[in-house]
């Protein structure tokens, strides 16, 4: 069925400065453990060369998920342009039970039709398992590829795809008038642009649940301040600029509240603002430091970091009252948690034996699995479907972004070429 591809990224507009030194995914390990799949180069039905390698985008997305291992193009037994041309036996002989084929066709008005078919080459040979077609302008061809990837991924795994999502992060460059930049890119590092430039540090970007805004910390006024920036027009709303520390913003899943940490009374404590009224209420109290809030799906409970037991550990508290409950017990310290959208697990920075890695904790059983193997890992952020984590780690004298699957098998890097990259935040579905 043909459908016009909806333009979900309304903030890709003229004020956004597109960058050339983009991050790119470099896979370190885990692809071989994925399910084999065939992704054929999409047939270009037009003159000259195709404007975009859609098949390559789909193959890269499926590979980057850690759940699939696309067959190398040099090993493809055939290159069919449609489902009818697929020879199932040729693929099943290589252990492949599903193949993606597609076509890209130019239209007289300058747009393109992008179509794909997912073909069964195993249990029901030749059956079309999923198919779709999108009409898009040239600048949306990559998005069309990610859309096809999302649909193929969901059909084969039962999990909603997250290939149309984005990541926000802070880049610190050397020198210049504005050495700190808040940037946004596609999840795979493409289409990067600057949201805000500053002569002073920027920290802790957090997405609104509809993907239209970013909250972050800025020091441009001479002290820390929390602001919310609307991506479509660049409008900035100041949320908090109290004496001492203002930090760690986190939007509630229902979009009505913003949690953050303030030290205006001396100790660092959690506060929640009602975004409609601007009213702020204090959630935690005491002499301990309480920070790094992350919401549970009900928008009523927070996980957060506290040193009330001596070393940092993760606790849970209801924003309407009640004593915080400690929820991490393994490792010498645990902090900076991010709760999954279904509330079943969280990822966090876990330290033990002098090592600081990203770990996953089952919130029902308390079981902990260390996911990463990089150095001085920080600030984990979950993909909205809970399958991947992006985080920063130290490499040489700098900081880079890394990806790891939540089963720990797939690992990749997103090395930048023009600065240190910190504070990654994965967007919601867009």
From Swiss-Prot:
Keywords: Cell cycle, Cell division, Periplasm, Signal. HAMAP family: TolB. GO terms for biological process: cell division; protein import. Part of the Tol-Pal system, which plays a role in outer membrane invagination during cell division and is important for maintaining outer membrane integrity. TolB occupies a key intermediary position in the Tol-Pal system because it communicates directly with both membrane-embedded components, Pal in the outer membrane and TolA in the inner membrane. The Tol-Pal system is composed of five core proteins: the inner membrane proteins TolA, TolQ and TolR, the periplasmic protein TolB and the outer membrane protein Pal. They form a network linking the inner and outer membranes and the peptidoglycan layer. InterPro entries: 6-blade_b-propeller_TolB-like, PD40, Tol-Pal_TolB, TolB_N. It is found in: Periplasm. This is Tol-Pal system protein TolB. Belongs to the TolB family. Residues 1-21 form the signal peptide. GO terms for cellular component: periplasmic space.
